[in-house]
């Protein structure tokens, strides 16, 4: 089978397809140059696919006319090319080959340039699409961050409002206990007894009354809060004080206890005065997780 590129080149030079195929076939498909040499050498050969001239028979033609016709055909035949003519023909064909090669290279160059333009254009379009997607993602991320910050701010406000409400409720509930007037301790009346002449008079010891007490509360992190309370204030007032003054607020529900003697105060104890719980005049309370 003839080489397609060589066949097309020969056809572009002006050779008929049949002669080009015959030249390539005769030279064993070794390329365009051997085929061109063959075409130059066989330029006078009739084309294998060109119809031969058929002279119609005419019974009225005599021998003399036939002889004249053959002589004319013989004289019309072209003489073989000389070496100089062959060189010129080869040179012309080589120039045609060079021209066709140059045209083909220029065409391929234009095609490569166009392909490069299309590639760059496609790359620019992809870059633009990628940039738009990145900008959209960044914008969405910024909107998400703004929304999260807004939600966090609202959540903090709700927590602060709840803490404020709880503090106010506890202050209303337990704050009145400390406003009770402190009545002086009742004097215990000792019945007068006649002194015995045989024994000295002994007065019973009087129990000292305290109207205030100093409470120290140790928090979970080891820090401490100290405050003075009225002896008749309820233990709930101490718990409220701890909740209000705990740095950052208490992390979780807690209970109060004493280490010696060990005692964990219950919710019922919160309603009892400090004096009744034995926390007067001073006491150390420890915060423990519930």
Swiss-Prot record:
Chain spans, region Disordered: 49-210
Coiled-coil portions: 81-171
Positions with biased composition (Basic and acidic residues): 80-117, 132-172
Keywords: Coiled coil, Cytoplasm
Compositional bias segments (type: Low complexity): 185-201
GO biological process: negative regulation of proteasomal ubiquitin-dependent protein catabolic process; negative regulation of protein K48-linked deubiquitination; negative regulation of protein ubiquitination
Record lineage: Eukaryota, Metazoa, Chordata, Craniata, Vertebrata
UniProt protein name: UBX domain-containing protein 1-B
Top-rank lineage group of the source organism: Eukaryota
Function per UniProt: Component of a complex required to couple deglycosylation and proteasome-mediated degradation of misfolded proteins in the endoplasmic reticulum that are retrotranslocated in the cytosol. Involved in ubiquitin-proteasome systems.
Main location class: cytoplasm
Keyword Manganese appears in the UniProt entry: no
Organism: Xenopus laevis (African clawed frog)
Domain UBX: 208-287
Keyword Cytoplasm: yes
Domain UBA: start-end pairs: 1-42
CDD domains recorded: UBA_UBXN1, UBX_UBXN1
Molecular function via GO: K48-linked polyubiquitin modification-dependent protein binding
Entry's Gene Ontology cellular component terms: cytoplasm; nucleus
Location within or outside the cell: Cytoplasm
